[in-house]
Amino acid sequence: QNDAIRELDLNNPVASYDNNGVFQDTLSYNRLFDADKPRTFDRKLREALGYDPNGTDWLDIDSYDPSTFSLDMFSANELLNIGSNAYVSYYGYDYLGNQLTTRPSLNDFYGTDAQGNSKRLIGAFEPIYMAGYIQDQFTFEDLFFNIGVRVDRFDANQSVLADPFVLYPAYTVGDLASTSLSGAQVPQGMSDDAVVYVDDLENPSAIVGYRDGFTWYTANGDIEANPKNIADASGGIKPFLKQPGVEEQKLSVTADESFKDYTPEVTVSPRVSFQFPISDEAEFFAHYDILVSRPDPSLNRFNPITYLQMENGDNGDLLANPDLRPQRTTDYEIGFRQVLNENSALKLSAFYKEQRDMMQTVSLTEAYPITYIAYGNLDFATSKGYTVAYELRRTGNVRMNANYTLQFADGTGSGANSGANIARSGQPNLRYILP
């Protein structure tokens, strides 16, 4: 409040005179009105109070009754308070709490209204999930088979960063021929999709490194485990930006290139089980399954406000990743079942389970414009073991089921946040196995 009149009009002093016209050695200054200050709330409050919306009257907010104010006096940016703690959080609604009747695009988020205020419209999280399966049971002599296949298709149905390491469009090796560095020597075998890093953002004259996905390379093409070494070679990480100085224009200019649509994931999951008798009182069984599960929505939802904060130098704490893939579990089991008598049976089995693409925190070290931590499909785990089960059917007043499992488990984390402290350490490529 009053931000537009905090400064004094030093170019137009007001002299003080007594009744006889004698100068009193005192100069005072009126408030200087700054029309460039964002001031939606200030302007609307002045209008509600009957003041000139562009006037210099000083308003004491604490002196007014709360009923004087309303939420629609604010702009979206004023309530989002980018660079500090937000006053509102929303998606599927506008910042005033009105439900959206259409699905806004990314351009609607960066677009402005008739007063020039950013709309900041954020659509609801509406992933598209489809699945289908076919299964058949049949016997062949003494063999009993249960065979099927399931197909899952997951589409997060939202925008994702085109490159999680660079917020703005950057040149790749394949683009160099049309740039000022067309004569640069590129190491043999370097992918055309590798992002180029240079010595200067505004006037690059040399290449200092490359990055292909999450793999970094020196200017000579050698794999670099620590991207900080590439950053140090140029006094800070400097991707070869297509629009130098774009930081002053922000993502509102580059949104169409900085983001892309989520690529749907299609998973084919075969499932096979069979069993056959060894004798009249014993049988052998086995199965093989692949299962998939969708990402946690709280870790997967696209929130464009996140990238506004990154542009302002705020990397948050743990950021959601709209580009997460489904998690996969592969399960094997073989076993033997023996009838002990007409009322009891014993089951012995061995199992192996492998889990891939599980959620874990990932440090995007030397991302541009700021290093940040997000969730990724990084974790894996394996478990194997044996199970002994005994079943006693009701005999008199006794019925019993007992089992014992011996399991050995290894993994890179016990939960999505178990690696957060390591990610915060700023050290790239640190992984560990538990236990």
Question: Could you tell me what each predicted segment is?
Answer:
Residues 111-120, 244, 250-258, 313-320, ...:
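Extracytoplasmic loops and strand-loop junctions of Gram-negative outer membrane beta-barrel proteins
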Residues 2, 162-172, 177, 255, ...:
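Flexible, surface-exposed loop regions and adjacent strand-edge segments
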Residues 135-139, 273-275, 335-337, 389-392, ...:
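Transmembrane beta-barrel domains of outer membrane proteins
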Residues 277, 283-295, 299-301, 306, ...:
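Membrane-embedded beta-barrel scaffold of Gram-negative outer-membrane proteins
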